[in-house]
Amino acid sequence: MNRPERLQPGVKLRDADKVSRIPVKIVPSERDTMLRKPDWLRVKLPASNQRILDIKQALRSNGLHSVCEEASCPNLAECFNHGTATFMILGAICTRRCPFCDVAHGRPLKPDAEEPVKLAQTIRDMKLKYVVITSVDRDDLRDGGAQHFADCIREIRKLNPAIKIEILVPDFRGRIDAALDILATEPPDVFNHNLETAPMHYRKARPGANYQWSLDLLKRFKERHPNVPTKSGLMMGLGETNEEIAQVLRDLREHKVEMLTLGQYLQPSKFHLPVERYVPPAEFDELKALADELGFTHAACGPLVRSSYHADLQAQGKEVK
């Protein structure tokens, strides 16, 4: 039996190379079998792209990454044009192979010790008042990357004392206690961890993750930091039912999660999980009504909503769709 080829540090695997060894095999989609994108998912491009180019240049010049680009977010033009970005720390190579995600898989390089300072300087230069920091999964690190998150928060606040910081963290598989101990030294203003989908779809969508583990991470952070809002996000269109999503909302509230994002899954390439249906806006409205009824302090529900989409407005409790 041939052994899998050893991954070389820093090499990005995408598309078929990325999903070749996940539990549920994906047959590449044929163009004539892919669902036609409905009109409500059409994104309007801004009249000018100068602001977009300026932000991309600021990221490149400091060796930084945005999840907006790495994950092919449909809202990139809108967010960049408004001068906001979600920064992705710890490199652009993930140790997981989630087949809904467009971030590359591989063997990551050692964390950049200068990244926290460069990130803080870039945020200062961009004059941001609210920033979202996320990361790839780093199962290769003893703390899952928690210390790097804490270092980034500390350096950002040094140069930007009035800023609000939201972190969107991985699940810290097998190292929750160590990660939470570290994050307690530099707690964020909002703590976000995405469940992504209903539990019965984890095997195909989130190989290596565990639904209950993710819920416990959110609850245990809240127990340590009762005044810091907790937040989670979900996608629709992966084969789940609305009732399954409704049960996830109930589970989130039982685990003291206060903020919610719910959006439409979009297939990044033919090698990723196919979209099984496009959820009409009216169904998102129904789920938002349920979220409000369950007691979420803020629920952003709509086809183009993403976890960090207008995160500053979400944190202020303003309507986002």
From Swiss-Prot:
E.C. no: 2.8.1.8
Pathway(s) where this gene product acts: Protein modification; protein lipoylation via endogenous pathway; protein N(6)-(lipoyl)lysine from octanoyl-[acyl-carrier-protein]: step 2/2
Cofactor note (record): Binds 2 [4Fe-4S] clusters per subunit. One cluster is coordinated with 3 cysteines and an exchangeable S-adenosyl-L-methionine.
GO molecular function: 4 iron, 4 sulfur cluster binding; lipoate synthase activity; metal ion binding
Principal localisation: cytoplasm
Protein localization: Cytoplasm
Annotated positions binding [4Fe-4S] cluster 1: 68, 73, 79, 308
InterPro entries registered for this protein in UniProt: Aldolase_TIM, Elp3/MiaA/NifB-like_rSAM, Lipoyl_synth, rSAM
Cofactor field: [4Fe-4S] cluster
Keywords, alphabetical: 4Fe-4S, Cytoplasm, Iron, Iron-sulfur, Metal-binding, S-adenosyl-L-methionine, Transferase
Chain ranges of the Radical SAM core domain: 80-297
Entry GO CC: cytoplasm
Keyword Iron-sulfur among UniProt keywords: yes
Protein residues bound to [4Fe-4S] cluster 2: 94, 98, 101
Catalytic activity reported: [[Fe-S] cluster scaffold protein carrying a second [4Fe-4S](2+) cluster] + N(6)-octanoyl-L-lysyl-[protein] + 2 oxidized [2Fe-2S]-[ferredoxin] + 2 S-adenosyl-L-methionine + 4 H(+) = [[Fe-S] cluster scaffold protein] + N(6)-[(R)-dihydrolipoyl]-L-lysyl-[protein] + 4 Fe(3+) + 2 hydrogen sulfide + 2 5'-deoxyadenosine + 2 L-methionine + 2 reduced [2Fe-2S]-[ferredoxin]
Family as reported in the entry's similarity comment: Belongs to the radical SAM superfamily. Lipoyl synthase family.
PANTHER family per UniProt: LIPOYL SYNTHASE, LIPOYL SYNTHASE, MITOCHONDRIAL
Protein name, UniProt field: Lipoyl synthase
Native source organism of the sequence: Shewanella sp. (strain W3-18-1)
